[in-house]
Every structure is written in structure tokens, then in C-alpha cells.
Amino acid sequence: MNIFYLHQDPEQAARYQYNKHVVKMILESAQMLCTAHHCIMGSDADVPYKPAHRNHPSTIWARQSGQNYAWLYYHMMELGREYEKRYGKKHLTIVKCEDKLAKLPGGILETGLTEMPQCMPDEYKDECSIQAYWNYYINDKKNIANLKTEKLYEQRPKETY
């Protein structure tokens, strides 16, 4: 369970992800969003997935504010668009969750976008969560990439965070 926060724009953050993460992170994002509904609304939650990893820092972050929830929802949808672009079909999780998760859970706080938790080994952490996730992604997650077909490193933004 994680959110690869590679850019503050949820669309751009989705584009930067390796193929395997585009596939996997759609479901993980939906699970975190569904868990937000369960934790906030209890038995009134009408969402496709049961709660998962309630106490994971990323799952907690998703339900801390409406803005966090919205960021993750838009990121999930952008991952879905990336999936469709790369694989030519719609991800089943998007089919199940797009409408159900579009609405914020009733009672979620409106406290603004909060700092993304850094769910990674300490050696990659940084004052800036985006830089930390790039450190983690490039150094720890490159083994899942097909470097013959994926050109992530060329796409990486040149600015320092």
C-alpha cells in the first residue's frame, strides 16, 4: 500500500509511473478511498471494496481531508487513463469505482491538502515528499521496470524539489 507521489499534479504523477505500478496502484488507490468511506461513514458506506490497511499512513492520509481524498481520486482516475492508453482497455477497478468514489465521504474534514506521508525506507526520505518519492522510485523500484520499453528517467522533471 502506497501512493507514489512523483508530482504535485495527480495527472503528471500517474504518467511517471512504471507499467507495473500503473496496473497495481489503481487498485491500491481504490482500496484506500473505499477505506476512507468505511472509516468515516461506517455501515453507511456504499463502496465496492471492503476496508483494507486502515492504519497504513497512506490510507490515513487519504481520509484526513477532502482535498487529500480528491487528490487521490483524481490520481486513481489518471492512472486509469494511463492504463487505457498503455493497454488499450479500461481497468476493472475504474469500472467498479469511478462513480462510487467520485463523491467525498460524508463528514470528511475540509482542512486542505496535507503533506504526503513518506512510506519508504529512511535512506530515501527528504524534506520534500516529491523528492523523497523520486529517491525511492529511482533507487528501490527500478527493478520492476522494463528498461527496454520504459523511459521514465528521460521524463523525470529536471527541477529540484
What are these regions (language model features)?
Residues 1-55, 59-161:
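Sequence termini and other peripheral, non-core segments
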